[in-house]
Amino acid sequence: MNALLTNPFKERLRKGEVQIGLWLSSTTAYMAEIAATSGYDWLLIDGEHAPNTIQDLYHQLQAVAPYASHPVIRPVEGSKPLIKQVLDIGAQTLLIPMVDTADQARQVVSATRYPPYGERGVGASVARAARWGRIENYMAQVNDSLCLLVQVESKTALDNLDEILDVEGIDGVFIGPADLSASLGYPDNAGHPEVQRIIETSIRRIRAAGKAAGFLAVAPDMAQQCLAWGANFVAVGVDTMLYSDALDQRLAMFKSGKNGPRVKGSY
């Protein structure tokens, strides 16, 4: 199979185009496929806070493959063995949580690259990513099609942001508002003015460095604000939260004493 590996999501980010996404926490291929038919530019399949196994992630990648929505996998952490597995099952774009230093960022980059450029274990002939060895020259061309995004979500990470942005192989930086606000001393209050100021400044620094800037905003007005600040890959909802809101709203139409969905300002 003489196939050329491409990553349209990465190319659009490189051009500075805005990409609107949805967070998937439901852990099922069925729900992932429903989301893929909605037309979001990207879908974050969450392996950090949602109870996804490697097989769950694999099945969700299969489910969304026929559609235009680009899957992004967030593993529970950025270890070399786990990154190897996620890449082998066919993920082209990764979002790595809790990256606090440039050294961590370099280790993550190395874990995604085959030798001599990194430390990714070689197993293309048994991997979905290489169509079980049928994609010719997979190892030679895969680096250009990988998109690596890292999460900055602590005061330490903010202090090291410029150094992280200088790491070759990092395509974008995602601001994690929930953990960041807690780290700054404002737990469960990403809307605090000081947190908002830091988010705005960070987004602008990321874009000024030539990297893509990402954010998850479950409140539409916050999503619009981040877009105005320059964020260009923004998730505007979480499937499980949207589902629970819809259930509450429908029940409130028929049962007295029900007030509809509760207001959720953060993830």
Swiss-Prot record:
It catalyses: 2-dehydro-3-deoxy-L-rhamnonate = (S)-lactaldehyde + pyruvate. The active site is at 49 (proton acceptor). The record marks 88 as: Increases basicity of active site His. One of its GO terms (molecular function) is magnesium ion binding. Its EC number is 4.1.2.53. The keyword Magnesium applies. The record marks 74 as: Transition state stabilizer. Binds 1 Mg(2+) ion per subunit. Its cofactor is Mg(2+). One of its GO terms (cellular component) is cytoplasm. SUPFAM superfamilies: Phosphoenolpyruvate/pyruvate domain (SSF51621). Mg(2+) binds at residues 153, 179. Substrate binds at residues 151, 178-179. Keywords: Lyase, Magnesium, Metal-binding. The keyword Magnesium applies. Belongs to the HpcH/HpaI aldolase family. KDR aldolase subfamily. Homohexamer. Catalyzes the reversible retro-aldol cleavage of 2-keto-3-deoxy-L-rhamnonate (KDR) to pyruvate and lactaldehyde. HAMAP family: KDR_aldolase (MF_01290). NCBIfam families: PRK10128.1. This is 2-keto-3-deoxy-L-rhamnonate aldolase. It comes from Escherichia coli O1:K1 / APEC. The lineage of its organism: Bacteria, Pseudomonadati, Pseudomonadota, Gammaproteobacteria, Enterobacterales. The gene is rhmA.
